[in-house]
Amino acid sequence: MAPIDVGDFVPDGSISFFDDDDQLQTVSVHSLAAGKKVILFGVPGAFPPTCSMNHVNGFIEKAEELKSNGVDEIICLSGDDPFMITACSENKHVKFVEDGSGEYIQLLGLELEVKDKGLGVRSRGFALLLDNLKVIVVNVGSGGDCSLFQLMKMTTTTMSNLPTDLLEEIISRVPRKYMRAVRLTCKRWNGMFKSQSFTKMHIGKEEAATRELRQTRMIVMMDYNVYLMGIAVNEIPSIETLGKLTCLDDSEQVKISQVFCCEGLLLCILKDDDTKIVVWNPYLGQTRWIQTRLICCVSGWKKYALGYGNNSENRSCRSPKILRVTDNFNIFSENIPLQYEIYDFDSDVWTTLDVSPHWFIMSERGLSLKGNTYWGAKERHAYGSIDHIICFDFTRERFGPLLPLPFSAWGAQFASLSSVREDKITALFQNCRAYKLELWITTKIDVNNATWSKFFTMDTPYLHEILSLKTFFIDEENKIVVVSNKERDTKGDLTHDSIDIINGEARCLWKLGLGKPADKNCWPLVCPYVPSVVQIKQHKGGKTKEQSDYKRH
């Protein structure tokens, strides 16, 4: 039979392998390769020197790189019996299968006659690149030798010659953890990440995959570092660290004390440096460092917010702004140093705003919603806890009126605020004496108005632990509340960071450990994460600094 060639469809046939439970399975080639991009390579038998050194090990070592180029499955076909194959099948990136009779090798036309040596029919050394069963690359060696480098070069060349729209469609399916390898492959592939059509396509596919897996993705700050994490919402939730986010080279890595999210952009406040802050798009790997104005205010504290002026219908073209509020802890003093400043990305200038507040912003963190920022607040000279919210409008650069919360928090009652995918405001009301937990969500919200609906009420003996939370968010689709927390020992001392998962519908709570922090005073922070295609503008003379979106943890 003529050897298989480019353009042919790979024939079907039966092959065998041992599964993870060491059970022998016999399946068809088509069941493994249909609808996928697959590398099928063959060796004459287990452990001949040429195959072991130049062929099998090469595919094992390059498996992740090949998969970053869009390969879904790597299959090694040998003429040995399946029991011999188990000896070299420990690697999870390559599937080792057996064609002991040589029937499938003969269907491919790649048999090697060695009957004169008493070995019967064996396979030539070969490698095929299949796309939905169709052969697009063939590489056949002699005596078992087959160049992995040549196949990888042909694979990359073949993909790079594809039309742009088709190439974008293929690479947009590559999982995020392989994206750094993709970007480093060639200039053309790296350039795709600056294309609006590609980034939107990739984000859409990533979000669809996340929904299918019932996974919630979030930004977590702990120990002054920032991580991308995912929570699998199953019967028993689990948490996975997807990567450590980094906006600088390792040699320059800084500690981050606060993170503020706005439509996929992060505003990062440095732990040990008041002279600058950084705005960061983790998805595009872009940063912009901004010098701050020094303020002599020993007893003051600073609150930051990141937002947009809504002057453009195209979100990717809107220019961000930063608000910094400097206020004093003593809310009953008449002579309080106050300063409201706004930074404009286009002009690269800080401007002082003329604000005479009759309110006091209670929450340390603001919430981004449709380009504006909302805080928990109260009347400036009133007693009590948070009982209102107030909005800063980044388009008009002014505050709106105080908007009442649907409850009043006094004494052993507490209120915390968050947002739902930056579309709604949520308020968590905690009553320590009655062991009640209420979650409210806005049905309408803008600068001047807010209406609320109760999302759920929950009785919980864990309330005393939840009271110490700093941040939370709600995942409406999976019907859970995600809360940052710290655990305590029997003496009441802080021990380790954790994530609390509250299911209001099932009336249950799970705790997921994050580990013991190096600094017990650094409270973990959580916020939902959705990738952004917004390009970060640089100030005049500046240059966009691009890094990989995250390092695999």
Swiss-Prot record:
InterPro entries: F-box-assoc_dom_typ1 (IPR006527), F-box-assoc_interact_dom (IPR017451), F-box-like_dom_sf (IPR036047), F-box_dom (IPR001810), Gal_Oxase/kelch_b-propeller (IPR011043), PRX5-like (IPR037944), Redoxin (IPR013740), Thioredoxin-like_sf (IPR036249). It comes from the Eukaryota. CDD domains: F-box_AtFBW1-like, PRX5_like. Keywords: Antioxidant, Oxidoreductase, Peroxidase, Redox-active center, Ubl conjugation pathway. It is an enzyme of class 1 (oxidoreductase). One of its GO terms (biological process) is cellular response to oxidative stress. PROSITE patterns: FBOX. The active site is at C51 (cysteine sulfenic acid (-soh) intermediate). GO terms for molecular function: thioredoxin peroxidase activity. Residues 156-201 form the F-box domain. Its EC number is 1.11.1.25. It catalyses: [glutaredoxin]-dithiol + a hydroperoxide = [glutaredoxin]-disulfide + an alcohol + H2O. It holds the Pfam family F-box. Residues 4-160 form the Thioredoxin domain. Thiol-specific peroxidase that catalyzes the reduction of hydrogen peroxide and organic hydroperoxides to water and alcohols, respectively. Plays a role in cell protection against oxidative stress by detoxifying peroxides. May be involved in intracellular redox signaling. PANTHER family: PEROXIREDOXIN, PEROXIREDOXIN-2A-RELATED. The active site is a conserved redox-active cysteine residue, the peroxidatic cysteine (C(P)), which makes the nucleophilic attack on the peroxide substrate. The peroxide oxidizes the C(P)-SH to cysteine sulfenic acid (C(P)-SOH), which then reacts with another cysteine residue, the resolving cysteine (C(R)), to form a disulfide bridge. The disulfide is subsequently reduced by an appropriate electron donor to complete the catalytic cycle. In this 1-Cys peroxiredoxin, no C(R) is present and C(P) instead forms a disulfide with a cysteine from another protein or with a small thiol molecule. Belongs to the peroxiredoxin family. Prx5 subfamily. Monomer. This is Peroxiredoxin-2A. It comes from Arabidopsis thaliana (Mouse-ear cress). The lineage of its organism: Eukaryota, Viridiplantae, Streptophyta, Embryophyta, Tracheophyta.
